[in-house]
Regions:
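Outer-membrane beta-barrel "beta-signal"
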Residues: 304-318
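Transmembrane beta-strands of outer-membrane beta-barrel pores
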Residues: 44-50, 76-78, 87-93, 128-136, ...
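Residues on the lipid-exposed face of transmembrane beta-strands in outer-membrane beta-barrel proteins
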Residues: 40, 44-46, 66-74, 108-114, ...
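Repeated loop/turn-to-beta-strand initiation elements of outer-membrane beta-barrel proteins
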Residues: 78-81, 119-124, 169-173, 235-238, ...
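Outer-membrane beta-barrel translocator domains and adjoining extracellular loop/strand segments
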Residues: 52-56, 95-99, 137-143, 185-192, ...
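Transmembrane beta-strand segments of Gram-negative outer membrane beta-barrel proteins
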Residues: 32-48, 79-81
């Protein structure tokens, strides 16, 4: 009798255990997949030249760039919310020359979009973009007078429009008829010079300061952006990003251009080669040129800015 009761107890216990395991399994399988996707990417890019008894001559040099990219993206049937933080900083050192900055960026992007039709690839969107830099910038070899600083300048874009997302988000196109652009120049010395398009200081005939330069310039205009990310061939990824802006109130039709084209060539999980170019044109950024050592000015106006990159990088993603 005792043995029968013991066997019945074991049988009931096993049934309860299996039922509990089955319930837990079903609960896990019914948990909704997270609609958030995250990306954390750290990249270190290096270039180096070294010469020993090289008959053609040359300077030893080493360059390094650190890049951090963080993304937090949300998407459901009707709503998309994309957030991105980008930062990069680069330095270069050559023999018999001071340490020089080669790259400096802090950028924050956020886009919120809504569609009322699941079949549509166009979203009514609000887009925010902010850019500035970490440290002082100089027109080398002159390091006595900075030409830019942290928050001098800083750019802020905020607009409403419509954005297209391809099926796999490889291609994004944003069109905004109304975007507010704010240019901050918080350093008063740069603001007094009228740097980056803000109103300069006003002086009387004796050179006495009458009114300080403005620290803020506000514009309203048209904003267009596109980004295309694709794998052009095996282990070669391309990112082509273009931003265009034109102010309604001041010289409408003069377009500010920000165009980045980058290729990542994957060698293995943690090593890549990087080839890239960055073109900037801003009608408010005036470049100075001198004729001679006396500092005689011959030109003051906007110019196309170009930066190129070729290097080997170490990548860590988590």
């Amino acid at each position: 009798m005792g043995l029968k009761l013991f066997l019945i107890f074991i049988f009931i216990y096993n049934l309860n255990t299996k039922a509990s395991i089955l319930k837990d399994t079903l609960d896990i399988s019914q948990e909704p997949l997270s609609q958030w996707k995250k990306t954390n990417n750290i990249k270190l890019i290096f270039t180096q030249n070294s010469f020993v008894n090289w008959s053609a001559g040359g300077n030893n040099s080493i360059s390094g760039i650190a890049k951090i990219n963080i993304e937090r993206n949300y998407k459901n049937n009707y709503t998309v919310w994309k957030n991105e933080l980008k930062s990069s900083y680069g330095l270069n050192k050559e023999d018999r020359r001071e340490l020089r900055k080669t790259e400096d960026l802090i950028e924050l992007n956020s886009t919120f979009g809504y569609r009322n039709n699941m079949k549509s690839k166009w979203y009514s969107s609000v887009k925010f973009n902010f850019r500035t830099q970490f440290t002082n910038g100089y027109k080398y070899p002159n390091t006595d007078k900075p030409i830019s600083k942290f928050f001098s300048p800083a750019y802020n874009f905020l607009g409403i429009g419509s954005e297209y997302f391809s099926k796999e988000d490889e291609l994004k196109i944003y069109l905004s008829p109304i975007t507010n652009k704010m240019t901050f120049v918080c350093n008063q010395s740069l603001a007094d010079e009228g740097a980056f398009g803000v109103a300069p200081a006003i002086y009387d005939d004796s050179g006495n300061l009458v009114k300080e330069g403005e620290n803020l310039k506000v514009e309203v205009g048209t904003f267009i952006s596109s980004e295309w990310k694709t794998e052009v061939m095996e282990n070669i990824k391309m990112n082509n990003k273009l931003i265009l802006y034109s102010d309604y109130l001041n010289k409408y039709g003069n377009v500010d251009v920000n165009w980045e084209l980058n290729f990542d060539l994957t060698i293995n999980k943690h090593v890549t080669a990087n080839v890239g170019s960055h073109i900037l044109y801003d009608d408010d950024v005036k470049h100075k040129e001198d004729v001679n050592n006396n500092g005689e000015l011959i030109a003051l106006g906007p110019k196309i800015q170009l930066k190129q990159l070729l290097g080997i990088g170490l990548v860590y993603a988590f």
